[in-house]
Curated annotation (Swiss-Prot):
Its main location: host cell. May form homodimer. May interact with host CEBPA, CFLAR, CREB1, DDB1, E4F1, HBXIP, HSPD1/HSP60, NFKBIA, POLR2E and SMAD4. Interacts with host SMC5-SMC6 complex and induces its degradation. Interacts with host TRPC4AP; leading to prevent ubiquitination of TRPC4AP. Interacts with host PLSCR1; this interaction promotes ubiquitination and degradation of HBx and impairs HBx-mediated cell proliferation. GO terms for cellular component: host cell mitochondrion; host cell nucleus. It holds the Pfam family X. Residues 68-117 are annotated as: Mitochondrial targeting sequence. The gene is X. It is found in: Host cytoplasm; Host nucleus; Host mitochondrion. A fraction may be phosphorylated in insect cells and HepG2 cells, a human hepatoblastoma cell line. Phosphorylated in vitro by host protein kinase C or mitogen-activated protein kinase. N-acetylated in insect cells. The keyword Transcription regulation applies. It comes from Hepatitis B virus genotype E (isolate Cote d'Ivoire/ABI-129/2003). This is Protein X.
Length: 154
C-alpha cells in the first residue's frame, strides 16, 4: 500500500509542511531555509540512515546506503511525473534491483533538494503543492499535524 503525502508551502511561516493526504496524522514541518530543522524523534530516523543530513523530513530509506525505496514526485496541478525529467533516480532504482551500487548519499541529498526546492524558487507558486507517493515503502515520513484538504486522491 502506498503512502500518500501532501507537500504544502506555508508562506506565513516559511515552512514546507508534509502531511498525510487521507487523514489527520501526527507530523512535522521542514524549514524552507533547510537550516533550522527541529530534530526528529530517535525512532523515526535512525542515526545510521542519514539523520545528520539536512532533509530529515524524507523517509529514512532516502539516505540509506542501499538507496531509496521506489519514490516518484507528482505535481498536484498537472499530475505529471517530474522525476523522469532528470533521469537520475530511475537509473539508481534500476541499478538497485540489479544489485549494483547506488547513488552516493551526497548525490541523493542534492537530488532531493533540487526536486523539492529549485522549481518552487524559480517558478513561484505554480507547483508548490505536490504529492509524494512511496510505493510499498515501509519507511515513514515525519509529517506536520493537520489534515490536507487540497488533494483527496492521487
Amino acid at each position: 500500500m502506498a503512502a500518500r503525502l501532501c507537500c504544502q508551502l506555508d508562506p506565513a511561516r516559511d515552512v514546507l509542511c508534509l502531511r498525510p493526504v487521507s487523514a489527520e496524522s501526527c507530523g512535522r514541518s521542514v524549514s524552507g531555509s533547510l537550516g533550522d530543522l527541529s530534530s526528529p524523534s530517535p525512532s523515526a530516523v535512525p542515526a545510521d540512515h542519514g539523520a545528520h543530513l539536512s532533509l530529515r523530513g524524507l523517509p529514512v530509506c532516502a539516505f540509506s546506503s542501499a538507496g531509496p525505496c521506489a519514490l516518484r514526485f507528482t505535481s498536484a496541478r498537472r499530475m505529471e511525473t517530474t522525476v523522469n525529467a532528470h533521469q537520475i533516480l530511475p537509473k539508481v532504482l534500476h541499478k538497485r534491483t540489479l544489485g549494483l551500487s547506488a547513488m552516493s548519499t551526497t548525490d541523493l541529498e542534492a537530488y532531493f533538494k533540487a526536486c523539492l526546492f529549485k522549481d518552487w524558487e524559480e517558478l513561484g507558486e505554480e507547483i508548490r503543492l505536490k504529492i509524494f507517493v512511496l510505493g510499498g515503502c515501509r519507511h515513514k515520513l515525519v509529517c506536520a499535524p493537520a489534515p490536507c484538504n487540497f488533494f483527496t486522491s492521487a
